[in-house]
């Protein structure tokens, strides 16, 4: 087994998210998520099947965009946006994942509705350089 590095882990996780959430290629996504995947999110059913089932049943227009990824050993944190959810607002999400034996093995998240300029107390966008329209 090759030694993992932060850069390799980042590329692995970004490819996994692209494969599942944007391409919706569930066969290929199975190569990234452990069969024993542990889910801590209150929004996602347990296990790999729970996650894949949620994505399968979600809106076809759902899209994931990443703006930041950080790695420390086998733990990674991503800051991203899910749009096209069929909800009044996009979701701004911080995902924390753990890699084990070459698979995504565990997941936690924090989810917040993306707000407009008018609703932002800070006056700063939550994702990227611009507020949603």
Give, region by region, the residue ranges found by the protein language model.
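C-terminal and inter-domain tail/linker signature
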Residues: 1-133
